[in-house]
Amino acid sequence: MNEDLQSATCSATSTPATASVGAESVGGAASVAVVQTEPQQTTKVEPHNVVGVGTETVSDTRRKRSTRFTMVKAIAIICVVLSHAGISGWLSHFVFIFHVPIFFLCAGYFFHTKYLNDAHSFVMHRVKGLYWPFVRWSVFFLVLHNLLFTCGILSEQPQFGNATMGVLHPYNWTQWSQHLWSIVFNMSGYNDFLCGAFWFFRALFVASLLFLVLFKILRKNSRFAQDKQAGWALLGCGVLLTLWKTTCGLHVTGLAQGGYRELLGLSFMAAGFLLRQYKVMERLTWKVAVPCAVLLLVASFLFPSSMAFNGKTLDFVSIFLPAIAAFIAIAYGCQFIDRRDTFVKRSLVHIGDNTLYIFAFHIVAFKVVSALKVACYGLPWEAVGGHPTVLNPASNVLWVILYLIAGVGLPLLWMAGYRRVHVYVKKGEARGVELLLTAGDYLLKGLGIALKGLLAGLVFLVLNFRKLSVAALKGIGRFFLGIYRGIKQTIKDIMSASSPEDE
């Protein structure tokens, strides 16, 4: 069910209400990172007469929802789609620096310390918003895996694979089962082509839990009683753990892809939390935003980086500050868009509210444009299986734009259609659940009867064990006695038949 963000009813000085990471929505999850109602000016509604009688008021005070960070997330997810749409060169370096880190920064920025005393709610939010969508959608594509080769959506031919000519292959039962286990127990094993971005679910899930655990541990020490002190300690832990991993080439045991993304995500969450504690966004001016934008541009030219799973120490150093700078600069720009109710603002807010679906399904949506590209260039249908797009010929600006529109638009279109029929779907689900419960009830009754019969038999055996044992022994004795007598009689008959006297 949707967990709609509610406007806060407290004053601007109160603690803002938050919606945690991946709050559950239609289909199982809402947007990727947390969205929060940011403090705004209190708007007083003047009293007015109702039909000319009395002085009743509609409301005394009202606070509007700030959509600035929703638009920040929208820009980030658009850049995620753009990075997979076939771009290259400087633009690719530019978007890879900040597009995914922004979601970790948002998660840390809106972390509420109330969860230190309510860890269960925090964990359940993450399970419902990150783990469950990951498992459900990964298993869905796993079920369709072999069929996708028949349809040509996936191909075993190297020229129709990824940029390194890597390809996937159909699974046998053992391979399929192993992938299922990896999905459920390790948040890995997903389809590397159609679900290639699903590592984000695991990274944010693990980073969020690690952030909470470390925060609770630090709070037990009086030195970290203040949020700022704890935030700096969390940042130090994240940075040191990441550097330890990269400098020594370590791998976090049991964590898919080694854990670099999870530790880097922890560092970004701590940085976002500190930005909130120091009220950087509330005091943000062009004097801060412009240098941040310059740092991002310089980094994209001189030392580009990304959240690749095999990141080195230089990659970590190159991405950390520029990504934070990008978050600040984009948030500064979005506050101007947030001032007026325009088409651009409404579009970005809608995209920002559905980032999880775009993140999960944009590569699948690319296949529609890939089919169009295959038709235009007269390529074999198997070329649709190229990951993430048709790689040869390379995409020009037109194809990049089409991939971008499809990657963002088609998941939104699908969700719009789903929301129109979700009432009927819910009714069908309720009926299905009712039938399952009824069947389960009959099954339990049958099992109960069988269990009662089994217990009655066991009781009878226990109570009559002596009698039954004696009867069984007598029966066995009679059986062997009969065999003995039969053998004896047979021998007698043979001896009688061969008697010399008769001869």
Predicted regions and their residues:
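Intrinsically disordered, low-complexity cytosolic terminal tails
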Residues: 2-50
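Alpha-helical transmembrane segments and their immediate juxtamembrane cytosolic regions
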Residues: 44-503
